[in-house]
């Protein structure tokens, strides 16, 4: 167990070292989002941490009858690109051969990679939340005017009593959904090549924009798609369950692929 823990730590060190510039760009994206919301939208008015964070994970509410976007979800797509890139980089970096030898078995090697991918995803969402918390002067509040005029939803204002639902919609669902997509990406990266996995991952994220469907994991990354913000929105519990099923199935496939694939 100690050897496996060291393997995880070494993987994390290698991942953070290789992706330091990507993390920097990610932080810049979050900061620019907060600055734009504060000065470009609210013109200096009070904005709470909840508003900042929702602006980051909201995605798009729905597509009109002609399948036209009312807005381009830049931050959602930014998350998609950063997470997909880091996932691919973790699977294919210069430390791999050392880690394979250190792991001793292929199963431990792939499990260590999956663990590091999950930790990176959690790290990115938590970093975004912390930046928003500090930007909102540590006040976790929501501005009703902002939701009605800018975010385009007033349903939330009338249906926001379930505090546990906040945790599911704002944190659990996006993290699990992103991880489910990364697991699909890993399957294609192992079976074909790294670029194929990245392309598949981005396709899933993009298709999810145009279809409100619990079977498309990208919907879990967009808070506005949930029943908390849409009258006929998706059930967050169903979204999480489907994503967990995807994770389990892809894990089984990965273990099967890795058992016969030459990874050296």
Functional labels for PLM-detected ranges:
Residues 11, 245-264:
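Junction motif at the cytosolic side of a transmembrane helix
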Residues 86-120:
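Helix-loop-helix units of permease transmembrane domains in multi-pass membrane transporters
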Residues 25-29, 193-209:
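Central hydrophobic cores of alpha-helical transmembrane segments
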Residues 30-86, 111-190, 225-243:
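Secretory targeting signals
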